[in-house]
């Protein structure tokens, strides 16, 4: 039994985490078990398509991508999915294709949007005393 060439990558945005399994196949792309064409919300569907459209659908004809996403809200999940797909494609090409095609993919992704490969490190600031949030203060009264 020969092992199917596969890689596993993840994408994160805020508290949403998407794990992508990229393996040799026939071009299927699924998110939480359903096709990528059914990603909700519909307005953000093209954000998920971005890695596919940037490099061309011919690169996806011989691989399958399965993405599992948990946590966060709708928008965070969409950004985590697109990052996981982009990182998975780069990792697959590095491991099983060649270095030149990997570098072409990385260059295409980073020139379009850096967050396709590098996670957004911003996190919520912790609340402090003297106010209801991190920066806002309670109203001051003089009399």
From Swiss-Prot:
The cross-references to InterPro entries, in alphabetical order and at most eight, read: Ribosomal_Su5_D2-typ_SF, Ribosomal_uS9, Ribosomal_uS9_CS, Ribsml_uS5_D2-typ_fold_subgr
Phosphoserine: modified positions: 34, 61, 76
Q: Which Gene3D superfamilies match?
A: 3.30.230.10
Q: Does the keyword Acetylation apply?
A: yes
Main location class: cytoplasm
Give UniProt keywords alphabetically.
Acetylation, Cytoplasm, Isopeptide bond, Phosphoprotein, Ribonucleoprotein, Ribosomal protein, Ubl conjugation
Residue ranges under compositional bias (Basic residues)? 134-143
Q: Which SUPFAM superfamilies match?
A: Ribosomal protein S5 domain 2-like
Q: Which of the residues bear the PTM N-acetylserine?
A: 2
Quaternary organization: Component of the small ribosomal subunit (SSU). Mature yeast ribosomes consist of a small (40S) and a large (60S) subunit. The 40S small subunit contains 1 molecule of ribosomal RNA (18S rRNA) and 33 different proteins (encoded by 57 genes). The large 60S subunit contains 3 rRNA molecules (25S, 5.8S and 5S rRNA) and 46 different proteins (encoded by 81 genes).
Q: Which family does it belong to?
A: Belongs to the universal ribosomal protein uS9 family.
This one is known as: Small ribosomal subunit protein uS9A
Q: In which organism is this protein found?
A: Saccharomyces cerevisiae (strain ATCC 204508 / S288c) (Baker's yeast)
Its lineage opens with: Eukaryota, Fungi, Dikarya, Ascomycota, Saccharomycotina
